[in-house]
Amino acid sequence: MRTKTFLLLCIAFITLFIGVSTLQAGHYYYKQISLKDGLPSTVRCILTDKQGFVWIGTRSGLGRYDGHELKKYIHQANNPHSIPHNLIYQMIEDAQNNIWILTDKGVARYQRQSDDFFIPTDETGNNIIAYSACLTDDGVLFGSKNKIFFYNYQDTSLRLLQTFDLEPNYNVTLLNLWDKHTLLCCSRWQGLLLLDLNTGKCRRPPFDCGKEIMNVLIDSQKRIWVAPYNGGL
């Protein structure tokens, strides 16, 4: 009798455990977004914004997934409020919930109310082409070819902040703030540079990791982690 009671208790416990586990697992939902949903085969970057949308940057345009369907945004030559180009380099959301899209032909800022894009220009009226971006306390820094642009939260302006010529044709493909006035710039094929945002002076870092850099990261203790091509970490 005791054995039978023990077995019944074990079965009841296992059943209860499975039921609780099933309820907990029910909070997770997995869905594959594939070619049949309209997603191009080459995904370059992904961003989840504060409203829960998933933004997908590809070589063939921009996608926004809301959990049910994928909406596509592509360049339209006759539409000044479409993205400037279909090749997406990077996406970033700032402290004001602006979503910035960095494309091959210019930077775009998503306008939620009209569901389209604002294309900022430089002082000559040309699109601002940037390959990387990073957040600061006061705004957003954008890395271009031998140039750094800055978007100011206070007056919502996007302007040229610094130029540098230590290396010609230096495309800033990665940006990180080392401290409040020193910017760590990375070019995929031309290595790392340290740019003083106050003076505009540029120099090489006090270590050599080669010129083919895949990625770079500054941790919470201000240590720099570099991933050279085929060179470990």
Model-derived features: where do they sit?
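Carboxylate-rich, polar loop motifs that coordinate divalent cations or form catalytic acidic clusters
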Residues: M1-L233
